[in-house]
UniProtKB/Swiss-Prot annotation:
Residues 4-210 form the Glutamine amidotransferase type-1 domain. The keyword Phosphoprotein does not apply. It is found in: Cytoplasm. Its EC number is 4.3.2.10, 3.5.1.2. InterPro entries: Class_I_gatase-like, GATASE, Imidazole-glycPsynth_HisH. It comes from Prochlorococcus marinus (strain MIT 9211). The gene is hisH. GO terms for molecular function: glutaminase activity; imidazoleglycerol-phosphate synthase activity; lyase activity. This is Imidazole glycerol phosphate synthase subunit HisH. One of its GO terms (biological process) is L-histidine biosynthetic process. Signal peptide: none annotated.
Amino acid sequence: MNTNIGIIDYGMGNLHSVQQSFKRLDQSIRIVKSPNDVHECNALILPGVGSFDPAMENLRRTDLIPKIKSWVKDGKPLLGICLGLQLIFESSEEGNSEGLGLLKGKVCNLPRNTKERIPHMGWSLLKQIKECPLLDNENTSRWMYFVHSYSAIPSPEDLAATVSFGDSEVTAIVWKDSLGACQFHPEKSGKSGQRLLSSWLKWLHEKNSDLS
């Protein structure tokens, strides 16, 4: 079975950079703007740059929210990136809108009792908490590029990796079943980001082979 990946276009995502990253991995990405665009896909990407409430409002306008919820409920793969990670939770301190509620938990301000600047911007090293398809088993450094002012507080069993912020560890990757998300930008994280996307792609190919 071919791997057909769709990236959700709701006006607040860095689509071109993500597409280029997958192009370097010889994987094409199709644009998803409406529920009808999802039919040919067997994996989805939810990117995001900006603020929580406008993002949820834009998603509502696409009529994709029910489709995204049923997609994840059916165990189909979805990858959230940056703001996309925050949107899959129930709520955010940044706004008043309900999130997608695909994972239990909420999004909170980054810790203020630190000398670290907010937004957290730049390269940081991941600390793996549990195995997940986004992280390969190679013993290599995982420096990723972050730009964010808020951090998700997931259920402990859904936390896959953290990153240091001052004296705190904040969420970097979450994973549950076939739903995963990263707070950083893999498409802007050089070889480390490419390796992460390649790991996800390999997992997708294996998953699709099992279904064919």
